[in-house]
Amino acid sequence: MIAFIDTSAFFALLDREDSNNRKAKNILEKILIPQNTLITSNYVVIESFSLIQHRLGLQAVREFHEDMLPLINIEWINKSTHQSGVSALLTASRKKLSLVDCVSFEIMRNLGI
């Protein structure tokens, strides 16, 4: 199985006060097996660094970088994927949809997730 991990999942795993912390940890324990591939994008990593640093501090960023990221395959966004994400964002014209979301959907579509 291939699973895409987004910023909200990373944050829930790190923030003990997050209402989804326990649920996120349980899901990670179930899917963190050699047969599965966990994927995120470099855009999600940047977004996660920013959110974690702002809300939880640099120690949490360090934990994320040193403990979590080594478990995840990072898809590096190329120009074509970026442009597809921008097009999707502008076409959708929805305030709560971000470029990171649109690029994530494009990656998942390309990988058949």
Predicted features and spans:
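Short, well-structured N-terminal submotif of metal-dependent ribonuclease cores
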Residues: 1-39, 53-63
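Acidic active-site catalytic centers that drive phospho-/nucleotidyl reactions
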Residues: 6, 47, 101
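Short glycine/serine- and small hydrophobic-enriched flexible loop segments
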Residues: 50-53, 109
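Helix-adjacent hinge/juxtasegments
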Residues: 52, 59-76
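Active-site neighborhoods of divalent-metal-dependent phosphate/nucleic-acid chemistry enzymes
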Residues: 74-113
